[in-house]
């Protein structure tokens, strides 16, 4: 697993949801909304980056505009790549992105 695989998963995800408007993000999904599911993934990626850097985990703000979630995802994935985590973390991140893309 490489950062290229994670980048590919991110680009596929963004191609699917990057154009969504607020009503699509608000649609219900098990345990909340589609936006809630993406925010949970953003938080997981941010936590994985913090762990890889040996830094404390910090809360990821839940912004009032769900359209910002894709940008938040881009930022935390870039942070994860910069942290140089192990292959297992990269694989899990790519897998979670792909799974959420299929769920949405």
Annotate each predicted stretch with a short phrase.
Residues 1-42, 94, 101:
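Short terminal alpha-helical segments
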Residues 14, 18, 46, 50, ...:
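Alpha-helical repeat scaffolds in large eukaryotic proteins
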Residues 17, 42-45, 60, 70, ...:
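Extended aliphatic helical segments
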Residues 22-69:
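Amphipathic alpha-helical interaction modules
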């Amino acid at each position: 697993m490489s950062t290229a695989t994670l980048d590919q998963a991110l680009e596929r995800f963004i191609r699917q949801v990057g154009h969504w408007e607020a009503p699509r993000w608000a649609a219900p999904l098990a345990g909340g909304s589609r936006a809630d599911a993406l925010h949970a993934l953003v938080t997981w990626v941010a936590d994985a980056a913090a762990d890889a850097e040996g830094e404390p985990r910090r809360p990821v703000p839940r912004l009032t505009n769900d359209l910002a979630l894709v940008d938040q995802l881009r930022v935390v994935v870039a942070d994860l790549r910069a942290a140089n985590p192990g292959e297992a973390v990269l694989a899990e991140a790519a897998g979670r992105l792909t799974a959420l893309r299929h769920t949405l």
